[in-house]
């Protein structure tokens, strides 16, 4: 429509964790295309992070690569101090990073559980605590990337599903606390998406052939495809836009309708 802004995030600064690949990469690039300068937080792959930064800069936006180990929440505050030095503000915080050991619950080790919750819960809270002062009274946006494992049992996802369920509870609490400050807080809960981590989960977590598993999921998904990083990025782009100023405290399932399919229908489809 003629009244829409070409670059709805022009002049804003976005921080995206886990942004060197997969969904995080797609989110960072979409926000940059919408006009935002971006902080590309990553754990260890500096080459891929550098490629994302280069793509953002080719779009005419500023970008800052920032290495951080979110399994150590104490690193979060210093990281946001660097963001403040570089940009002086933050308007959008997307907590995308996650990690877990894809194992049955009875095989989980304490350090795996602790690391999963350190990244999904402790570092998320530390990030919000650090970012709120940088929003400086302007309308702010916080988006957490959750998953359908917070709503239903997914094989070998017990620990991550528990962490994501806790994450969505925090989203609701933060939405109530931060709403009066003009900050919205929402979650996106993707299903199976075409990402490196999804392939790793299928092949190593449940010992299935990736292409076969994807084909079976497509067969029982109402829209007859699986998601891409760009699908998540499009939803995040809406949630951080001015158009979503009245939407907060929600966890939106993004799975092409798969969780709405009954078990009977799945059996009939051979899923």
Model-derived features with residue positions:
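Short C-terminal tail/terminal secondary-structure segment
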Residues: 2-5, 237, 248-271
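Conserved glycine-rich cofactor-binding loop
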Residues: 13, 20-21
